[in-house]
Amino acid sequence: MSLASTLPRASFETLLQHTNFMDGIKFVFFAFVVYSCFTIAVGWVVYEWKRKAHGCGKIPRYPHRDPFFGFDIVFGMAKSLRNDYFLVWLNKVHENLPKTFLVNFVGTRFIYTIEPENMKSMSAINWQDFAVGPMRRNNKATAPFADKGVNTVDGHEWEFSRFLIKPFFKRETFTDTSRLTLHVDRVLEQLPADGETVNIQPLIQRWFLDVTTASLFGESIESLVYPERAPICWAMVDVLRGLRLRLQWYKYLWLFRHQAWLDAVEVVHRYLNAHIDRTYKELDEYKRQGKNPEAADRNDLLWYMASNLQDKEALRSQICLIFVPNNDTTSIFISHILWNLARHPGIYEKCRQEVLALGDAELSFSVLRNMKYLNAVLNETHRLFPNGVTQVRKCIRDTTLPVGGGPDGKQPIFVRKGDVVQVNKNVIHRDHDIWGPDAEDFRPERWENLRPYWNFVPFGGGPRRCPAQMLVTAEASYFLARLMRVYKRIEARDPNPYVGVMRVGPSNKTGVHIALFKE
């Protein structure tokens, strides 16, 4: 007797349907596996053919514990970001490996490199073969904080964004140190008496917030005078830290869900909306009266941008991607300088003597620019604590990089469309082959006869080089020179080692606890 004859008809049909369903699932799974294997095989054959056609060597591979998906490196990165040891983790990834190697990031080919020549090629020679948009905007990594801006787009859209922000970085702006005087006066007034411990980092952040808002919006927020206005500064810190996590996750940012980050974004948006609404209202009044906006008393960046962009959300996006990252750059840079000087009193004294040798001379841009040892201190800080730890680009057409292939790593490598190249600048800046056995040491004297090129790239290079370098240098130099005219020595009051918390770049987790002495 058959099984079918012993079962009720309904039960038999149910079993039959279930069997057909399971067979279908098996068939679909089998077809998927076959298709995947076929696609991978064809892709590998095509890649190898192109690699050989370009005369390129094989790229060494990272020794994954999970070679299929690369979850080991994904989870390692996530853990390091969550527990604030990303810089340590990144250095360990490069330990005992060639200077260029291939990483599997959940199916996406990442090429990690610390070769200056590859940085040069990606940033300057073949820069149009690479793009930032797929890494930042196309996958909504910066949304809802911002959309289009100089840091997130390519091509003509990037050229337009660059046009919008150009006045902020013009020579007349960064050479005018008088715009800093009042705000530095206020910082010096708020520093405690001789020998009292102070975490100077939040104070510097408020100082730079005051400086930046004056230049961007035509009026300073004056958070040093009105501390209750400072929360916008801390909201920007939260936004930047969230952005760093989202950018690191690449196309898997759906794993990032933090309501606190969205709340911080809302705080920043409300603040900017008020300035944008005021500016558009003033522009409309100018136009109603038949006046030329270029002849207005206002010469701040927002006025210029609003005159050339009439879409409120688009304007807010553009200003977000300048205002928030820029506010973190100089303040954290100065914090890093003071963190190091507090641990090297001899360097502080040598730098101070150079400042005192100026007498009562005005601290103009030209004067500060010619202070060799002060600038060496700035460069050494940039080297050990670059604001941009990595430079990441997605390849948008098949191309090559000059080195990294073959057994000796000297052959060019083939980079196919869709590959992601990550130059780890923090590792380059500490490479013993470039900087010597004391590469980890803070030693400004190394800059006395040093003329670096692509092995020192704190602001990137090529057409997309960050235009803020001279602005940051002028602001940091002026602040430090004013401080050194007042305080004879500096002392560290935090014995803990540096722990880098990632935002745009790293900042010390515990701040900068120091004591300053006038005598």
Swiss-Prot record:
Cofactor or coenzyme needed: heme
InterPro entries, per the entry: Cyt_P450, Cyt_P450_CS, Cyt_P450_E_CYP52_ascomycetes, Cyt_P450_E_CYP52_fungi, Cyt_P450_sf
Residues annotated as transmembrane: 27-47
Short name of one Pfam family: p450
SUPFAM superfamilies to which the protein is assigned, alphabetical: Cytochrome P450
EC class of the enzyme, as a word: oxidoreductase
Enzyme nomenclature, EC number: 1.-.-.-
Associated pathway: Secondary metabolite biosynthesis
Glycosylation: residue positions: 327, 379, 508
Induction: Expression is positively regulated by the aspyridones cluster specific transcription regulator apdR.
CDD domains in the cross-refs: CYP52 (cd11063)
CC terms in the record's Gene Ontology section: membrane
Domain of life: Eukaryota
Keyword Oxidoreductase: yes
Localization, UniProt: Membrane
Purpose of the protein: Cytochrome P450 monooxygenase; part of the gene cluster that mediates the biosynthesis of aspyridones. The polyketide-amino acid backbone preaspyridone A is first assembled by the PKS-NRPS hybrid apdA. The assembly of preaspyridone A is initiated by loading of malonyl-CoA onto apdA, followed by decarboxylation to yield the acetyl starter unit. The growing polyketide chain then elongates into a tetraketide. The adpA PKS module catalyzes three Claisen condensations, as well as beta-keto processing and methylation.
Name of the protein described by the UniProt record: Cytochrome P450 monooxygenase apdE
